[in-house]
């Protein structure tokens, strides 16, 4: 469907370069800072096949992030070369941990999240639970599948 939409936009006279740049190539400075911080502080397991990124509330404040900077950040760790399953933990204002897991085919994000009372599907799943960030990272690491 994306190609058909792009073709319709082109036929209608849309400036495709500007459209593409606005949708896919432009990030706020806050979002880029966040991505750098996540990579620097990520926990890589199973020879880089698994990554866990934890975002404490204090870091959001320290980096001066706004909600748009953090929106859909759960897909970012999965974009790291070689990563097959990625977990992002974000501490919400109420203190709960929001877990988002993304996986490539052959791995089950929902199975990881089910261990924390959550759900979803094999490619993307989530859960929210009460736990300290440090304990949550350890628990999520323990819940990850064995890599073959």
Say what each PLM segment does.
Residues 1-85, 91-95, 129-147:
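A structured phosphate/pyrophosphate-recognition subdomain
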Residues 98-101:
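Primary mode marks residue(s) on the alpha4-beta5-alpha5 output face of response regulator receiver
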Residues 104-106, 133:
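Helix N-cap motif at beta-to-alpha junctions
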Residues 108-112:
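Short, glycine/polar-rich helix-capping loops at beta-to-alpha or helix-loop-helix junctions
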Residues 117:
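Aromatic-lined ligand-binding clefts that engage carbohydrates, nucleic acids, or primary amines
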Residues 121-129:
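Short acidic/histidine-rich active-site segments
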